[in-house]
């Protein structure tokens, strides 16, 4: 059995920087046609020049791959700065509530403040797409749910602004995207295939720790059903986020799952298991093209076959290991060719 996926798109990707970028980028740039690149670096991408500099670093270390750049939402995003970004082809803003995830210490503290709303108004006028890490302070399993009032306010206040709920993780959020025409979402491999049991049901597995948390069986099943039917308001976004094993085994574990090396084989396995392979093309590419109005992307064909693939346990950077999701396991699908 074989399947060919055309122009795979990752609508949420972390490729880090410097040596780590060089070590992990190929896992995404080779099989994927394009990816929405996250701006929460150690020095956040808060303006056009730093974003373009980072884009150039990605382009120098890849080929036939389109990084779709995003700006880190901050008070310095004046109308003039947004216009400058737009002129350079930057179409995405990423809003991080302060302290909610990795490198979000510079995030937005007042989500409904006057400055935030002013920036969103300008973003709407210019046709930007708002991507949001939709969590609010509160009990860890309710953080996304607690952000619903903010999401509703955004959706109603800015009806022409496309708003993406990144890495949807709570089944209660599904009603929001079905209620509001301008609300969309991305889904990760880990949120549609894993639960809290994978993180802490046996021994604590730090390599399954991410934000937002993987949640209950009910959440996983409801989100998986969206993916399997390629819900038209949902696109695939891996949120692949590599960390060194030494950090993952420390007393203060950073959030992030490095899934990039297994994405296409694991998705094929999952969709085949549920008799939904015919919908994988829409989930992995077609929906994103429509939602984000993407065209002129590099042409890619990823051919996969139903042959065993033993997942490497890790990759190496600077003599340090980076653990790969499902490392050591055997997947039933294998990436055979990229053209």
Swiss-Prot record:
Sites of N6-carboxylysine modification: 94
Signal peptide: none
Top-rank EC class of the record's enzyme: hydrolase
Active site: 239
Residues binding substrate, per UniProt: 14-16, 40, 133, 243, 255
Cofactor note: Binds 2 Zn(2+) ions per subunit.
Domain of life according to the entry: Bacteria
Coiled-coil ranges (or none): none
Keyword Metal-binding set for record: yes
Cofactor: Zn(2+)
GO BP: any one term: 'de novo' pyrimidine nucleobase biosynthetic process
Gene Ontology molecular function terms on file: dihydroorotase activity; zinc ion binding
Stated family: Belongs to the metallo-dependent hydrolases superfamily. DHOase family. Class II DHOase subfamily.
Function: Catalyzes the reversible cyclization of carbamoyl aspartate to dihydroorotate.
Assembly: Homodimer.
Name under which the protein is recorded: Dihydroorotase
Source organism of the structure: Helicobacter pylori (strain G27)
Gene giving rise to this polypeptide: pyrC
């Amino acid at each position: 059995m074989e399947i060919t996926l055309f122009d795979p798109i990752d609508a949420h990707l972390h490729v880090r920087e410097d040596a780590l970028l060089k070590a992990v980028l190929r896992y995404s740039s080779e099989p994927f046609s394009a990816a929405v690149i996250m701006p929460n670096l150690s020095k956040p991408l808060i303006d056009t020049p730093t974003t373009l500099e980072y884009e150039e670093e990605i382009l120098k270390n890849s080929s036939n791959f389109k990084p779709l750049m995003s700006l880190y939402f901050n008070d310095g995003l004046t109308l003039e700065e947004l216009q400058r970004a737009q002129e350079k082809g930057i179409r995405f803003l990423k809003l991080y509530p302060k302290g909610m995830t990795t490198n979000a210490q510079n995030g937005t503290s007042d989500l409904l403040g006057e400055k935030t709303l002013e920036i969103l108004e300008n973003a709407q006028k210019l046709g930007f797409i708002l991507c949001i890490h939709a969590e609010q302070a509160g009990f860890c399993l309710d953080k996304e749910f607690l952000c619903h009032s903010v999401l509703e306010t955004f959706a109603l206040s800015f009806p022409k602004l496309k708003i993406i709920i990144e890495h949807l993780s709570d089944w209660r959020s599904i009603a929001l995207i079905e209620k509001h025409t301008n609300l969309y979402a991305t889904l990760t491999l880990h949120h549609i295939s894993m639960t809290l049991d994978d993180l802490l049901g046996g021994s604590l597995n730090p390599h399954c720790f991410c934000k937002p948390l993987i949640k209950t069986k009910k959440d996983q099943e409801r989100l998986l059903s969206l993916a399997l039917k390629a819900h038209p308001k949902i696109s695939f976004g891996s949120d692949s986020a590599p960390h060194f094993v030494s950090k993952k085994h420390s007393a203060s574990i950073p959030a992030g799952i490095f899934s990039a090396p297994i994405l296409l084989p694991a998705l094929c396995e999952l969709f085949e298991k549920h008799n939904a392979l015919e919908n994988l093309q829409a989930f992995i590419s077609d929906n994103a093209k429509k939602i984000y109005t993407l065209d002129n992307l590099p042409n890619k064909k990823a051919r996969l076959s139903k042959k065993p693939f033993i997942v490497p346990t890790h990759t190496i950077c600077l003599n340090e290991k980076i653990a790969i999701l499902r490392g050591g396991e055997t997947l039933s699908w294998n990436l055979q060719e990229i053209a």
